[in-house]
Amino acid sequence: MAGHQKEKAIADEVHQNQILRELYLKELRTQKLYTQYHVNPLRKVHTIARKPMSWHDNLEEPADARFLNLIHHAAQGPRKKYPETQTEGQEIGWDSEPLVNPQRDDRRLNHFRVYKDITLYKAKMWSLGEDDRHK
């Protein structure tokens, strides 16, 4: 069976030309060249916003004072906008002034580092790597 292969007969030029013509016409039917573009009415259209930092787009627009005041008011902190807190979270730190005037010379509240002779001596020993805890 493997030895009984049929050899294809070479088609004549007329038949070959007819096949190529059918292929060419089929390609022309399926291929569509778009030269006119339009918006599809069934698709959702996205609005294209202008560039706010572009100087050439905004030449004709005058500055709106009311809009600028609104932006400046929104940029202020809540303490400048409102006389009292608006939420419970704002209550923390709303009054930033200390309740008691801090006195820097009061030893009960202020514990500053004090360098005396013994502390300077011990700091020097530690910087040299000596340790006398076990003596």
From Swiss-Prot:
GO molecular function, a single term: microtubule binding
Keyword annotations from UniProtKB, A to Z: Cell projection, Cilium, Cytoplasm, Cytoskeleton, Flagellum
Similarity field: Belongs to the CFAP144 family.
Subunit structure and binding partners: Microtubule inner protein component of sperm flagellar doublet microtubules.
Compartments reported by the entry: Cytoplasm, Cytoskeleton, Cilium axoneme; Cytoplasm, Cytoskeleton, Flagellum axoneme
Lineage of producing organism: Eukaryota, Metazoa, Chordata, Craniata, Vertebrata
Segments of this protein annotated with the region Disordered: 75-100
GO cellular component, one term: sperm flagellum
Record carries keyword Cytoplasm: yes
GO biological process: flagellated sperm motility
Protein name as it appears in the record: Cilia- and flagella-associated protein 144
Pfam families, per database record: FAM183
Function: Microtubule inner protein (MIP) part of the dynein-decorated doublet microtubules (DMTs) in cilia axoneme, which is required for motile cilia beating.
